[in-house]
């Protein structure tokens, strides 16, 4: 049995990752493939802790945790994700589509001041995907899409972070050959077609006729 195909979708908030992941999963299923659609943070216990951190501003039991501890929690969740979901599915020849992966940790936590080399080191265990689609969109458009403009102060704070994260994603695309940048300002249908085209390009190179 051939190893499955591992695809990751990345991008700043509001770039359309979840929508495109679902469309991609449906496309593979319509073409006769078994698909595992997954995400990070996951639904494991580590993932639940991380979701709580995101919602409550990195506070556990009334105390704010360090950025380093937060990064290690993300890595722990990812380790569970790899061992319990990603690797077993790939061994079974399935197509694995992940909405976010370790690139998110690198882009976001680097933007918050952590050392990139250290972030790469603590995520070294994570296998690289066959292709990582980076849905690129200007921060203002992304924020507009997720409707987080309740106040100018909140908008300005979010904009500055997303702007830095976007810059980091572009830098990461130059570091990791598997990252393919796609303009996510286009229509949902156009973006979907470009994703399919990008996947077909690496499909033949890595797998031959499937």
From Swiss-Prot:
InterPro entries: P-loop_NTPase (IPR027417), Thymidylate_kin-like_dom (IPR039430), Thymidylate_kin_CS (IPR018095), Thymidylate_kinase (IPR018094). It catalyses: dTMP + ATP = dTDP + ADP. Pfam families: Thymidylate_kin. One of its GO terms (cellular component) is cytoplasm. It comes from the Archaea. ATP binds at residues 11-18. Transmembrane segments: none annotated. Its EC number is 2.7.4.9. GO terms for biological process: dTDP biosynthetic process; dTTP biosynthetic process; dUDP biosynthetic process. One of its GO terms (molecular function) is ATP binding. It is an enzyme of class 2 (transferase). Keywords: ATP-binding, Kinase, Nucleotide biosynthesis, Nucleotide-binding, Transferase. Belongs to the thymidylate kinase family. PANTHER family: THYMIDYLATE KINASE, UMP-CMP KINASE 2, MITOCHONDRIAL. This is Probable thymidylate kinase. It comes from Pyrococcus furiosus (strain ATCC 43587 / DSM 3638 / JCM 8422 / Vc1).
